A protein has these predicted regions:
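N-terminal alpha/beta PP-like core and its mobile active-site loop of ThDP/TPP-dependent enzymes
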Residues: 1-227, 237, 265, 269-272
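Active-site diphosphate/adenylate-binding microenvironment
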Residues: 237-315
Length: 317
């Protein structure tokens, strides 16, 4: 039943195989593209005796997940396309957070003054208040965000498969426009590269290492970096205009309360480093659009299959 949604499923039919299966399960879950695994243990296994020495044979505490670097030629090619682009965009997904590559993303964006859009799962990859963050794309993306992504000459996808919700069902010219844009893509999972948009350069590798490689090559091509104060000013105006457009409904005292009012009141009292979980529906999409997240890893949405009931269970752990 669960095999289609896990990386691998095991059934423990021999109690002596239990330690080895658990060891393999944890290794697989954390390797490559992190994901769930299933270890099915029948009830009668827990009442059987086993030799404790079998646990000593596992690799307890020795799990080191290797991070694959980009092919050097791919890193150079991506750097060259970004350095030559007139209107590039970095499109960040949840892979940035899984790779803990937020600092590297910010460093590349700031060096070339490239705007950063994000997916739902990518919220928090760069502070929503960062002067180069242009916000979420897709069904809940803002018009200003899409005005930059649809007119980009180069988009570098980072840890995202350009999924349906983040790409407005792939309708041309709504969120992205393949006729105008050259797509580049980096992902830890090679099966995701070019899955939904054709790519000129696709590279498999860890984003934390890969972004560092690209920045190193970019610095060779543009020793002074780039500054685009006009772009930063446009982004700041767009953010201010959006906040202003929500000001009235966010302060409305009607009953029942508006979702915007709830978000405003919660934002005023919640600590900046509080960890937030959303569920399916407006609370997920509204928070992603209107609730500024400034610290990576402090917001978790049920993206992908959008499992209803994710929020309460995630909070409980």
């Amino acid at each position: 039943l669960l095999e289609p949604v896990v990386k691998r499923a095991w059934r423990v039919d021999d109690v002596e195989a239990f330690p080895d299966i658990l060891d393999k399960a944890f290794r697989l879950a954390e390797s490559g593209r992190p994901g769930p695994v299933l270890v099915d243990v029948p009830m009668d296994m827990f009442s059987r005796e086993m030799d404790e020495d079998l646990w000593a044979r596992t690799h307890k505490g020795n799990l080191v997940t290797m991070r694959p670097a980009l092919d050097p030629a791919a890193a150079k090619a991506i750097a060259k396309r970004l350095a030559r682009a007139k209107n590039p965009v970095l499109h960040a997904g949840g892979g940035i957070l899984l790779s803990q590559a937020s600092e590297e993303l910010a460093a590349l964006a700031e060096y070339l003054d490239i705007p950063v859009s994000r997916t739902l799962a990518g919220q928090g990859c760069l502070s929503d208040l960062h002067p180069l963050m242009i916000g979420q794309t897709g069904f809940w993306g803002l018009e200003f965000t899409h005005s930059l992504t649809t007119n980009a000459d180069v988009i570098l996808g980072l840890g995202t498969r350009f999924g349906e919700a983040d790409s407005s069902s792939w309708y041309q010219g709504v969120t992205f426009d393949p006729d105008k844009t050259t797509f580049l893509q980096i992902d830890i999972d090679p099966m995701e590269i070019g899955r939904n948009y054709p790519v000129e350069i696709g590279a498999m590798g860890d984003l934390k290492i890969g972004l560092g490689q690209i920045l190193e090559e970019v610095k060779k091509l543009c020793p002074e970096g780039r500054n685009n104060p006009e772009l930063r000013a446009r982004i700041a105006r767009a953010k201010a205009d959006f906040k202003q457009s929500n000001a009235a409904i966010s302060s409305d005292s009607r009953f029942p309360m508006t979702p915007q009012r709830i978000l405003k009141d919660v934002k005023e009292v919640i600590p900046e480093d509080a960890v937030i979980f959303t569920d399916v529906g407006w609370n997920k999409n509204g928070v992603a659009q209107e609730f500024d997240i400034t610290i990576p890893g402090t917001i978790h949405h049920s993206s992908g299959l959008a499992t209803m009931g994710f929020g309460p269970s995630a909070v409980l752990g």
